[in-house]
Amino acid sequence: MPLKRSLKESIERLSSFQSKYNIFTSINPSPYSITNKKGTKETLTGCVASIKDNIVTKDFPTTCASHILENFKSPFDATVVKLLKQAGVHILGKTNLDEFGMGSGGVHSIRGPVINPLYPHEDKKIMGGSSSGAAASVACDLVDFALGTDTGGSVRLPACYGSVLGFKPSYGRLSRFGVIAYSQSLDTVGILSKKINVLRKVFHTLDKYDMKDPTSLSVELRELIEGNKKVRRPLKVGIVKEFSHESMPIGFHRLYLSLLEKLINLGLEIYPVSIPSVKNCLPIYYTLSPAEAASNLSRYDGIRYGYRDSELDIKDGILFAPTRSKFGTEVKNRIILGNYNLCSDAFKNNFIKAEKLRVNLIDEFDGIFRFPNVLTNSKGNPDGLDLLIVPTSSKLPGSIRDFEEEEAKSPANSYINDVFTVPMSLAGLPSLSMPLKEKTPIGLQVVGQYGDDSTVLDFVESIS
C-alpha cells in the first residue's frame, strides 16, 4: 500500500483525488487488497500500481479514452501486466490519457482532462500527456508506480509536470504485446514512480524477451549488451548545444546550474556536444508517427470490435465512416495527416526522406557515445560520452483553458512540447526524466546509448 497508509485512509484519499483530478478510467472494486504472497528482494510483492488505459487487461475495460473502444474488454492481459501480477503487484486501476496516446496535454479524453495535482485545483493546470493519469496517480501517492506508454515523450513530459520520475527504456526492452498501437516503431512501455529503487525493480521485472512481440529485443542482443558493460570512470556527460535553454521556465537555470555543480563535485566530466540532426526531429516525428497511426487505426471498422452504430440502416459502403466518426478531433487530425504522408507524392517527398533523416540522427548519436549500439553494429566512440542531460520541457504547465485555446488556433502549437523528448524516441534511446526540485514541474532528462539503460538508472540513483 503506498506510503503504508491504513486501508480506510487510502480508499478515502483515492475517492477524493479521483473526484478532483480525474485520474482513472476504471478502478479495482477492491482497491488496496494486497496479496498475501511472500516477496523477495527482486519482486514487487505488496506494491500497488496503475496501468495506462491503452495497455490491455482482462480484469478492467481498455478504452484508450475513446468512444470507439468505450466498452471493450480484452480477453487477455498484456505481457507487462502479466509479469507484474506474477511478481505480486496489486493493480489499482486504469489511468486516463489522451485518446489513443495522441496528445501532450492530457486533455483529449472522453473522460475529460486530467488536472495537475501540484497546483490548487481551481487553477486547473494541464498534467501533460499522454500518460497524464499515470503521472497523476504517482504524484498523488495513490500508487507505488505506474505503467504508461511513451511514443514521443508521453511518459517523460507528464512525469516532469507532476514532479516524479518517468523512464522510457530502450525501444524493444519491454514487451509491447497487449499495448494498443499508436506508432509501432516508436511506442515504448514506460515506468513512473517517485522512488528510483522502485522504478529500477519494475524495470528488471519487465525487462524480458517476449516471443509474442516481434519488436522485442532478442536474447542474443540482450546478452551482447550485458557483455559490453564495463566500468567507465569518470563518467562523461554531454550537454547538447542545439537545445537552446534561452526560453526555459523561470527557475530552470538556477536548478540546472546547481545540478551541474553537483556533478562536477562528484568527479564527473561535462562536455558540450553537437547533434545537428536534432533540429529535424519534430518534422521527422510528425511525418512518421501519424502515418503509422493511420495504418494502425484502420482496424477500427466497427465489425470485429469497438463501436458500431446499431441504428444504421446498413447499406453497402456506409458502415465504415459512421463508425470512425467516434474518433476524437486530435485522432482524426493525425489520421488525415498520416494518410496524406502515405499518399504517392508525399510518400516520396516526405515519408522516405523522414526515414533517411531518422537514420542520420541515430548515426550521430552512435558517434558521440562510448557504449556500442548493438542494433547498428556501432563499435562505440572510445573518447565519447556516457550520458546526455537534456531539459524535459521548455514550458511550465499552463491552464487547460489556455492549452485548448492555443490548440484550437493550430494543433501544431501543442506539438512544440515534444521538442526535447522526440529525438530520444526516434533513436530508441533510454531516457529518464527526473525533477530538479521536489514538487516543482521542472525536469531534466538523463539519456544513454541504446541498450545502456543500467547506466541511466545508476546515474539517477547516485544523485538522488
Swiss-Prot record:
Keyword set, alphabetical order: ATP-binding, Ligase, Mitochondrion, Nucleotide-binding, Protein biosynthesis
SUPFAM superfamilies for this protein: Amidase signature (AS) enzymes (SSF75304)
GO molecular-function terms, A-Z: ATP binding; glutaminyl-tRNA synthase (glutamine-hydrolyzing) activity
Catalytic class of the enzyme: ligase
Catalytic residues (UniProt): 52, 130, 154
Subcellular location(s) per record: Mitochondrion
Gene Ontology terms: cellular component: glutamyl-tRNA(Gln) amidotransferase complex; mitochondrion
GO biological process, one term: glutaminyl-tRNAGln biosynthesis via transamidation
Keyword Transit peptide: no
Other observations noted: Present with 486 molecules/cell in log phase SD medium.
Subunit structure: Subunit of the heterotrimeric GatFAB amidotransferase (AdT) complex, composed of A (HER2), B (PET112) and F (YGR102C) subunits.
Protein name: Glutamyl-tRNA(Gln) amidotransferase subunit A, mitochondrial
Natural source organism: Saccharomyces cerevisiae (strain ATCC 204508 / S288c)
